[in-house]
Amino acid sequence: MTEFLPFVARHIGPRHEDERAMLAALGLPSMETLITQAVPASIRLNRALNLPAALSEADALAELGTIMGRNVVKKSFIGAGYHGVHTPPVIQRNLFENPAWYTAYTPYQSEISQGRLELLFHFQTLVAELTGLPVACASLLDEATAVAEAIGVACRHHRDKRSRILLAGELHPQTVDVVNTRAEPLGWEIATGSDVDDNTAAIVVPWPDTRGVYGDFAKVIADAKAKGALVIAVADPLALTIMEAPARWGADMAVGSMQRYGVPMGFGGPHAAYLAVSEALTRIIPGRIVGQSVDAHGRAAYRLALQTREQHIRRDKATSNICTAQALLANMAAAFAIWHGPAGLQAIATRVAALAARFAAALKAAGVEIAGESLFDTVTAKVPGKAAAIAAEADKGGRLIRIIDADTVGVTFDETSTEEDLTALASLFGAKPVGGDTVLVPGKERGEGFLTQEVFHSHRSETEMMRFLRRLADKDLALDRAMIPLGSCTMKLNAAAEMMPVSWNTVANLHPFAPAEQVQGYAKMTSDLEAWLCEITGFAGVSLQPNAGSQGEYAGLMAIRHYHQAWGQGHRNICLIPSSAHGTNPASASMAGMSVVVVNCRPDGDIDIDDLKAKAEKHRDNLAAFMITYPSTYGVFEEGIKAFCEIVHDNGGQVYFDGANLNALVGLARPADIGADVCHMNLHKTFCIPHGGGGPGVGPIGVAKHLVPYLPGHVEAGSEHAVAAAQFGSASILVITWMYIRMMGGAGLKKATEAAILNANYIAHRLKGVYPILYTGAHDRVAHECIVDTRVLKDSAGITVEDVAKRLIDYGFHAPTMSWPVAGTLMIEPTESEPKLEIDRLCDAMIAIAGEAKKVADGVWPADDNPLANAPHTASDTLATEWKHPYTREEAVFPGGAFDPTAKYWPPVSRVDNVGGDRNLICSCPPVAAYG
């Protein structure tokens, strides 16, 4: 790769000599020959991508530094759901900036995910303690979408027989915007006021409201209870450390943002939202839930619980389309609470509340009218005709306050606010603060009886906290240890140079509603990224707002819906989806108000074009969209893709292109050229944003020219149909993708795609003599991933795909995607970043496992006592005094004899009991009093 800058060669795993050896193994003379065989000529891009030439790491960092230097970072008192924070350095360095945490995948393989599962369990415990509700999920995307998700829970609770939602107080404008977007296709009636009727599914109570005021909701809550409506509290989690828990005053659900628990504003994200519910709602809440179970030896172990609720299983009947959430940020929030403990959290909250109370008192003394009598951190002041002038004066002093309207301003205090700030802000109103520590929060004080669990009291010194985070990280297997060959997940390198800017002050510490002239760096960076993604995909416009791939799907389908409505075709509501589709596809279609019609696939995995044609023609008067993943979820470039698109267009539909497998296309083909009208791009797959152990993700959408007017809007931009709380979604991590594209250039991106395809075909070639490769395209080639049929081991030896997955842990690997899209198989995606040495190690392990299964088939090892059935093996099990197994300890933990013992990964638990964990659901740690 001498023609490329060093970064490209560092990003791509195989060296030049490795590439030649792999091609030789495939019997091919060149990479060009492989691409000609694997990628249909009809879709190939016959020109280079028109992107800026690649830069070195140093030059790209310097250029981005100059761009983001255009941002003017001033101290924000805007509030509206976003607050300044002090991220504890021990958390920033040992968690947020630690690849052991941010390169991990969603913890579906429990045995190699105990560290992050444990911290997410503590996050759920934190939320349950704050809200007084027994069940919390392990994060949602942001506060606005969390409110919408809670409303969805309420409607499902009433079996969709009630559709009216009462907003009982003033929510943040962006929350109302997102709720209205979600309501329209689902037929929710959004009302305001205090009138609860028999059709009301839920009331939404802001606690406090967007003005900072705690209203008197006693009557409307009582009315809701009398009418059977659920009560949803939108509650500030910092305020809840000194206030009565929402469950105490009648909340059935509570939602909010955990951003102020140590997570920077980041110009809007990413941040973890929380959702907690009463026990009766447990099985219909969205998102992932961490539960406690036991392993095969009775040791406590964590796992993802109640997965049958999730979109990948229930599809169009799922409770939500939430897939990727905000695990990394939820873990930061949990660590923040563990670091400070309950007393520390209460000290922060009390100080913030006292600053706000003193500010309110000073304004009142100066004759300024303020909203409400009870408040936590925000003071809303009436300043007839002077709002802009006062805000301008604050700006001159380096502080930003919120202009609510021409006559009203809001000032929100936070953890970073000082006495100097208080004095300066009061002076803008002709006021002078006095001393005191009175707070104005309503109701009973929280007291000391919360977060009594030991973990929130044991890590007061930095030494203890550092070691705590290290111990958790050591339990997990992430990309910093080994290959994660998950099909359809694209676990590629997240380069250090890409990650560094996320922590820059000019990236991390801007409020999303800061004045436009102060965020010109973000404007330039996002404009660059939109243009580059348009060039890569061929589309006319891009929205960066969706903060997960699932939200990109939803945004894209909503753009199609609004397009049809604009042309008087609002009756079009049929969405054709192949039977092989990702589970989010049908879930998103249902959320967008569409009815799903399944298109069959042929035995070779390709879409049945005759079935597609028949169903498109049958529904031609009502056809809205066709959702297709390309390359297919079976890991094959289907030759008929353009014909599929033509059939849909001929029958009045739009083509939605699921970009989950875009890593096989970049630089080789473009969705828009193929015939797609809209496509979402997983920046946390193809474009190097890390998975974070289950989020954050970013799922921007690209659209053809006719759909550009229907891209997501935002209330702050004077438009509608937002799908996320902030205009640019998880804006701060967009710099990762900016850096990746800037350092790779068009030629480097194409080379990465070619390497990904080569790696997958090399794996398929090495394994096909042992395991059938389930689907291949022309010339017996796969795309960037392949499905390995392990059912042959089940047939010959009774060895299940789960046995293989768990045995791979003993070999030092995260298992490939298990039983999807075909039950009993493994789907392997190596990405371009894995070197040949690691790929060979995986292949050697898979071949060795087949050999172990043969020993079971031949009767050498019993079917119920062999290394596969007992996998994974922990150090404590292996060191037990008695060893009664028919295989040796060495065969258990150093299989194949090809491992460096010093590099051995030891799982902390043996196989986790999934069934028992769901039957006996434990998803938070009981308080100390429960053991009395």
UniProtKB/Swiss-Prot annotation:
Gene Ontology biological process terms from the UniProt entry: glycine decarboxylation via glycine cleavage system
Catalytic activity, as annotated: N(6)-[(R)-lipoyl]-L-lysyl-[glycine-cleavage complex H protein] + glycine + H(+) = N(6)-[(R)-S(8)-aminomethyldihydrolipoyl]-L-lysyl-[glycine-cleavage complex H protein] + CO2
CDD domains assigned to the protein according to its UniProt record, in alphabetical order: GDC-P
UniProt-listed InterPro entries: GcvP, GDC-P_C, GDC-P_N, GDC_P, PyrdxlP-dep_Trfase, PyrdxlP-dep_Trfase_major, PyrdxlP-dep_Trfase_small
Keywords of this entry: Oxidoreductase, Pyridoxal phosphate
Residues with N6-(pyridoxal phosphate)lysine modification: K685
Cellular component terms (Gene Ontology): cytosol; glycine cleavage complex
Domain of life: Bacteria
One GO MF term attached to the UniProt entry: glycine binding
Cofactor(s) required, per the database record: pyridoxal 5'-phosphate
E.C. code: 1.4.4.2
Broad enzyme group: oxidoreductase
Role description: The glycine cleavage system catalyzes the degradation of glycine. The P protein binds the alpha-amino group of glycine through its pyridoxal phosphate cofactor; CO(2) is released and the remaining methylamine moiety is then transferred to the lipoamide cofactor of the H protein.
UniProt similarity note: Belongs to the GcvP family.
Subunit structure: The glycine cleavage system is composed of four proteins: P, T, L and H.
Record protein name field: Glycine dehydrogenase (decarboxylating)
Organism: Brucella suis biovar 1 (strain 1330)
